[in-house]
Design a protein with these regions (language model features):
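Core catalytic alpha/beta fold that binds nucleotide/phospho-ligands
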Residues: 1-212
Length: 212
């Protein structure tokens, strides 16, 4: 049995299944963490962070089950999930929602709350270059939505990038070159990343699975 009260939804996107967990942190009890083999390392965390972490790992467990693996990801020295061989995976959180996806290749998933016009104006220069803004405006999407997608896509692209290359990376290393009604193209170190996205009125989700 899975701990903490939650509701699972399977979201198909680009041939993958994202496991979405909507959870109620008010139902979280510290003993719920005993479900995780490494629970002792989480005891110093605040309750909210513990609940979010647990929700992400519940999503990860469902995602691994989807591919026939009953293990849970271990935890790395940066608190990152360590996926069982031969799988790659990714986890993301936003409010009372957590997502996870597992794939046979490097993969990144990200969920973000949609920017308001005011927030988009404040954050624009820290997320995109003038050249990228041209690509966003060409998409025909409302600018706050396009900027949220750009931010989320760079997060997903970063997560899909091999860990050895991640350390010195920032947003400027990923360039948005195109956004369509369902995809987004990024350039990173002369590689083209093709991402897929979906949006609701409140949130966006981006998925980056690298070509093998």
């Amino acid at each position: 049995p899975y701990p903490m009260r939650h509701h699972r939804t399977a979201l198909p996107l680009a041939g993958y299944t994202i496991q979405q967990i909507d959870f109620d942190p008010a139902t979280f009890q510290p003993e719920d963490l005993f479900w995780l083999p490494y629970h002792a390392s989480l005891t110093g965390w605040g309750r909210k962070r513990q609940a979010e972490h647990l929700a992400g790992r519940i999503a990860a467990a469902y995602a691994l089950r989807e591919v026939g693996d009953k293990q849970l990801p271990a935890i790395g020295d940066q608190r990152q999930p360590l996926w069982p061989t031969p799988w790659f995976g990714s986890i993301s959180h936003c409010g009372q929602r957590a997502l996870a996806v597992v794939a046979d290749r490097p993969v990144g998933v990200d969920i973000e709350r949609r920017f308001t016009p005011q927030l988009a104006a404040e954050l624009e220069s820290s997320i995109i270059s003038p050249a990228e803004k041209t690509a966003l405006l060409r998409s025909g999407l409302p600018f706050p939505l396009a900027l949220t997608l750009a931010f989320s896509a760079k997060e997903s692209g970063f997560k899909a990038t091999p860990a050895a290359n991640q350390r010195a990376l920032g947003f400027a290393d990923f360039q948005i070159v195109e956004i369509t009604a369902s995809t987004l193209a990024l350039m990173f170190a002369e590689q083209r990343y093709l991402l897929h996205w979906i949006a609701s009125e409140e949130q966006v989700i981006t998925l980056c699975a690298l070509q093998q």
